[in-house]
Structures are given as structure tokens and as C-alpha cells.
Amino acid sequence: LLTVHRKLKPTGAERVVWGDADRHYFPVAQTPWGPMASLICWESYMPLARVALYEKGIPLYLSPNTNDNEEWQATIRHIAIEGHCFFVNCDMVFTRDMYPAGLHCPEEIGRLPDIVCRGGSCVVDPYGHYVTQPVWDREAIICADLDLTQVPRSRMEFDGCGHYARPDVLKLTVDDR
């Protein structure tokens, strides 16, 4: 276990059970491949959270989630380009028969499609190209050889937190005391 991450802001019905994470749950893990960080599910829609990770120079961005649609695929490709990092999308596959027997809402479960969450796990490079294509409608372990030299090469072109930044005009402050 490299680190622990709590979701910064629970989404929708998650708020009934969980509260906001505090600033100590915004970790970046040091690995032999460079800093690695994660935002969970819709945290990746939080621009300031993404920039906080980009400013730490992450070459690897991991996102466990349940977004199984083409719009999410467009989002992760954008994030990979924006952050000039590899985006590892860990999307679950969930079928109706995976619900435990005896839940209090069998009629609602019965109306669900056979495949509730289609997956879509994949890896995207810093230029927004798929290293592995999304895997739909089945469980799979995806493997990819990543050319980490793509990260600094892509940042030579555009580095929103480096040579292309304007800290005299725009600044992000992260309270991680």
C-alpha cells in the first residue's frame, strides 16, 4: 500500500453515507516511475484538484470510477492531454446478478439492465491516444508498456504548470498543512 486517498467530495447519494475528505487525503505516492496520484470518479471533473496534481509533476494519473460512457472517454483523453500524463482509467464492470440476494428493493434491481456498469478501463498517453483500447462489458486486467519519455517530450510542447503558466496572473493554493 503506497498511500490512502479519500474522495474529496462525495457524489450524489454518496453524501448520505460519507463526508468530505480533509486536506490530508490528497496524496501523491512516490514510485520508481515518478509521482503517481489518483482522483476518484467525479473528482476528475474538479479542475482545481487536477491542477493540484499537475503541479506535483505526476506522469501517472489513476482514476477508479463507474463512468461507463463515451463522454467519460472524451474527458479522460482531455485530462491526459491537459496534464501531459498517462491516464489509467480503472472502470468497473457490474452486472445485475452481482447485487446481493435479499436487498430491500428487488423490483428496482429487476428493472436494471443485465450489465449495470459497462466498464471502459483503458490507458491513455500524454497526447490523448489510447495505449490500450477501452474494455467494455467484461472484466479484464489491462497491461501496457508505457514510454515515460513521452511525458517530458509532451511538456516541451505545452506545460500548463511550467513554461506555459502565468503565476503572476493565475495561482492555485492548496492547503495541505
Model-based region annotation:
Residues 63-64, 90:
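Generic beta-sheet signal
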Residues 28-30, 79, 113, 133-134:
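Short secondary-structure boundary/capping segments
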Residues 60, 86:
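Short, Asp-centered acidic motifs that coordinate Mg2+ and/or phosphate
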